[in-house]
């Protein structure tokens, strides 16, 4: 009986060897499409070591999403008069033995807190569109109409489009596969009119925990 069962399984497996799947079709089946910005779950491009989050404009225009890399680490200076060597751990009774653990030491709060907070990841920077309306005022998120965004998961490209004062704006966002860099194209009559530009912001790191945005 067992030999017959094994033979049957082997025969079944053999028939499936020639089967193929359309990997691109499977991936594109999960293409991400949205018409608004999710403030806690942005669209992203990246390469495994670097990630750039965007809002519905294809950049970080209205929401300060993070730009993160595996090498983006930061440490604040040590408090005055404090050294790392001052921390020796906290002795904890473990089955009758005193074992040092890396826990917060109430007797040495400054160095304990510093070690808990440093080093920490930080936001490399923010890149967004600087846009003005026909009357010269600064564009707000509510001023955009017909917003649409798609993430092509197969190509790793984000396509965003919207209208401002009736003029269409198309933004394409991609990430380099072998370096921490993004490439962006902006197509719109508003560019020639000088009503669309780019701004950069470099937030300073902070030590707040469980924050959506770093810096």
Q: Over which residues does each language-model region extend?
A:
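Glycine/threonine-rich ATP-lid/beta-loop region of ATP-binding domains
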Residues: 14-16
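Sec-dependent signal peptide recognition
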Residues: 1-3
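C-terminal motif of bacterial Sec signal peptides marking the signal peptidase cleavage site
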Residues: 10-12
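Beta-sandwich/jelly-roll carbohydrate-recognition scaffolds of carbohydrate-active enzymes
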Residues: 18-215
């Amino acid at each position: 009986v067992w030999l017959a069962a094994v033979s049957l399984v082997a025969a079944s497996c053999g028939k499936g060897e020639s089967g193929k799947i359309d990997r691109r079709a499977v991936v594109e089946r999960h293409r991400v499409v949205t018409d608004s910005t999710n403030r806690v779950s942005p669209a992203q491009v990246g390469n495994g070591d670097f990630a750039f989050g965007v809002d519905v404009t294809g950049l970080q225009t209205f929401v300060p999403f993070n730009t993160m890399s595996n090498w983006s680490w930061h440490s604040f200076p040590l408090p005055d008069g404090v050294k790392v060597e001052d921390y020796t751990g906290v002795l904890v009774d473990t089955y009758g033995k005193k074992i040092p653990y890396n826990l917060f030491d109430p007797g040495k709060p400054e160095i304990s807190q510093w070690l808990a907070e440093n080093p920490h990841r930080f936001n490399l920077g923010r890149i967004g569109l600087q846009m003005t309306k026909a009357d010269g005022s600064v564009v707000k998120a509510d001023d955009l109409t017909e917003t649409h965004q798609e993430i092509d998961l197969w190509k790793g490209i984000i396509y965003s489009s919207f209208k401002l004062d009736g003029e269409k704006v198309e933004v394409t966002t991609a990430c380099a596969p072998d370096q921490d860099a993004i490439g962006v194209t902006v197509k719109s009559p508003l560019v020639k009119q000088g009503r669309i530009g780019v701004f950069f912001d470099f937030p300073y790191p902070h030590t707040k925990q469980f924050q959506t945005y770093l810096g």
